[in-house]
Structures are given as structure tokens and as C-alpha cells.
Design a protein with these regions (language model features):
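Second-shell loop/turn segments in exported
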Residues: 34-42, 85, 111-112, 169-172, ...
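Short acidic/polar inter-strand loop motif in beta-rich domains
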Residues: 309-320
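Hydrophobic helix-coil surface modules that form long, contiguous segments used
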Residues: 1-95, 124-127
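Acidic/His/Gly-enriched intrinsically disordered linker/tail segments
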Residues: 115, 119-185, 189-190, 207
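Zinc-dependent metallopeptidase catalytic helix centered on the HExxH motif
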Residues: 83-141, 199-200
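Beta-strand-rich binding/interaction modules
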Residues: 228-229, 242-245, 249-309
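Amphipathic alpha-helical substructures
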Residues: 165, 170-257
């Protein structure tokens, strides 16, 4: 039994196997079919508890009286308040579907109008969890791969209503992959703790309400003290692309150290602050100019100039982000 439930489902079978556990005082129920060996021996119970614990650390306390995780017949996953149906026992899928308890279950966006608000958010949280808990960096491949897709051009913006997407492949990119990458860029721009503070405020202020994009933007602005209208407009409401490039770079002796001059160009209509790294020293370029030149001093002779060294931008061509300094 639960209250403030906006949609529901059920699944029945006389053959289900059952395991149970607790997160705090919240019962976790796991149902799976005979022969689903990867689901038993407490494995999925433990992964479910781990996912719920982490998500509470991002948003706040889970408000429902229980959570059920069952093995669905098909692959993938489906989410409902207090119930997720997972096509497999993997931690990543479990985290994604559990994330929907918050992003869509408790914070109820309209999936026809703003699919990215829950699917993109859940995908973002899945990658953040993998980074935070498992020490992996899923973002690097995501940003590089999406940058290549961006270079080919996407037909519509992320904020396009689901029924207006031209095909299912585009829907997958714009509801899941690209908004996940955009939210990662935003987290890196604001800082992880500011992002977390904003999501906690999102939950505190809008739990069990219908939410829209502006609700998310406003709490992140409040948490950061920064106007984010430019960011949301640029990345969610246009198809603008971004490509930073090293136009030229040279280095020379400067007293006891080395002075390196770097000229950077920007093509495409999008803009983000850019980190330039030379010999371990970093400078952030905040201007929106098409061409910028920066001088960076290092103690040792640097080997190369690298733009966006942490791979946090949706850059359409990473091949021009690095230039060796000969000599």
C-alpha cells in the first residue's frame, strides 16, 4: 500500500522466487523466475539497497514504505512508484530504474513533453553512481561519442516533445544520452556538491508535484547563485554545437621557466568555459570570443597544449584539442 501514487503496475506468477532485505527500515522485495541464478543469493537485494542508499544521498530520504524489484520477461526496465521491473540484475540498470523513483515517481514530469527530465536525469545519475561508487569514468566515452554525433547534426533540440521526435533513434539520443551529457557538463561547471545541493532542493521543494524544466533550473540557480538561463536555452532548446581548437601554440624560455602562448578558436554557436592545460598548469577561458590568446607559465618545458583535458565538454572534434610543442 502507498499514497501519492500516480501510476501503477503489477506482476503475478506462481513460479516467482522471493528474497528480501532492508535499507534502513524500508523493506526491499526481490522477485525472480526459477533459473535466474544471477538474481539469487542476495545479489540483487544488495544492489537494490546500495542504489537506494546512494540516491537518498543525492535527493533525500525515500518516502515510500517499500520498494519491489522484479525480473521482467523482456530486457530493459520499467519504473513505477514502489516497483521497478528490471530485465537484468546489473547494478547500472538497477540504479537507473531506482532513480526513476525520484525522477518521475516523486518529481512527476510529463514524459510526452519533457522526457529528458526523467530519462536523461536517470541516465546522468547512473553514470554519476558508477563514477562515485565504482571509480570508473563513463563520461569520457560518452562525451567523445556524442561529440561525433553532434558533428553530424541532430534534427531537433533535446526539449522537443516526444511525439514530435522524427524517429526512435533520435528519441533515444535526445531523451537519454545527450541530456545525460548536458547534466554532466552542468555538474562540472557548478561543482558536484553544488549540483547535489540543487537536486536536494529540487526534491524538498517539488516532491509529489508535477515538475517542468524551469523548476529544475530555478533550484540549481538558487544553489549556485548563478543565472543558468543561457545554459538551459543553449543546450536544451537549440541544436547549437561547439568546437574548440588550438589554432597556434608556441613556447619559449622566460627566466627560470617557460612561457607558452596559445591561441584558441571556437566554431559553432554554443559556448562553454574552456580549460586550457599546458605542462600541468591550467587556465579557464571565460570569454565568449571566437578567438582568444592566453599566456601560461610553467617551470619545465611543456610537451603539449590540451584543451578540455578532463573531457567534460560536448566538443564535436577532439582531434584539434591537442597540439604538441616541438623543440
Amino acid at each position: 500500500y502507498g499514497e501519492r501514487i500516480h501510476h501503477f503496475a503489477w506482476s503475478t506468477s506462481p513460479d516467482y522466487r522471493y528474497e528480501a532485505g532492508l535499507h534502513r527500515d524500508i523493506p526491499i522485495h526481490v522477485l525472480f523466475r526459477p533459473g535466474d541464478l544471477d538474481w539469487d543469493l542476495g545479489a540483487v537485494v544488495a544492489r537494490s539497497a546500495r542504489a537506494l542508499e546512494w540516491l537518498e544521498g543525492v535527493f533525500g530520504p525515500y518516502p515510500y514504505p517499500q520498494l519491489t524489484n522484479l525480473h521482467r520477461i523482456e530486457g530493459g526496465g520499467t519504473e513505477f512508484p514502489m516497483l521497478v521491473m528490471d530485465g537484468g540484475p546489473g547494478q547500472g540498470l538497477i540504479l537507473h530504474e531506482f532513480a526513476h523513483q525520484y525522477a518521475h515517481g516523486i518529481l512527476g514530469n510529463n514524459e510526452w513533453k519533457d522526457a529528458w527530465l526523467d530519462e536523461g536525469m536517470a541516465s546522468f545519475l547512473g553514470n554519476w553512481f558508477a563514477e562515485d561508487v565504482h571509480g570508473v569514468e563513463p563520461w569520457r566515452g560518452t562525451m567523445t561519442g556524442l561529440g561525433r554525433v553532434e558533428a553530424q547534426g541532430l534534427p531537433v533540440p533535446v526539449a522537443t516533445p516526444s511525439h514530435e521526435m522524427p524517429d526512435y533513434g533520435t528519441y533515444g539520443l535526445l531523451a537519454y544520452s545527450k541530456p545525460s551529457a548536458i547534466l554532466f557538463m552542468l555538474r562540472e561547471h557548478l561543482g558536484a556538491e553544488t549540483m547535489r545541493r540543487g537536486l536536494q532542493l529540487y526534491y524538498e521543494r517539488h516532491a509529489f508535484q508535477h515538475v517542468v524544466e524551469d523548476d529544475l533550473r530555478q533550484v540549481l540557480e538558487e544553489a549556485s547563485g548563478e543565472d543558468l538561463g543561457w545554459f538551459f536555452q543553449q543546450w536544451f532548446h537549440t541544436t547549437a554545437t561547439l568546437d574548440y581548437a588550438v589554432a597556434s601554440a608556441s613556447t619559449e624560455r622566460d627566466g627560470d621557466g617557460w612561457s607558452t602562448s596559445v591561441t584558441v578558436t571556437r566554431t559553432g554557436e554554443a559556448w562553454m568555459p574552456l580549460t586550457v592545460e599546458v605542462g600541468g598548469e591550467r587556465v579557464v577561458l571565460e570569454e565568449r570570443a571566437r578567438t582568444q590568446t592566453v599566456e601560461i607559465t610553467t617551470a619545465e618545458r611543456p610537451e603539449a597544449v590540451v584543451l578540455d583535458p578532463d573531457v567534460v565538454l560536448l566538443d564535436t572534434d577532439r582531434g584539434n584539442n591537442r597540439q604538441a610543442l616541438g623543440g
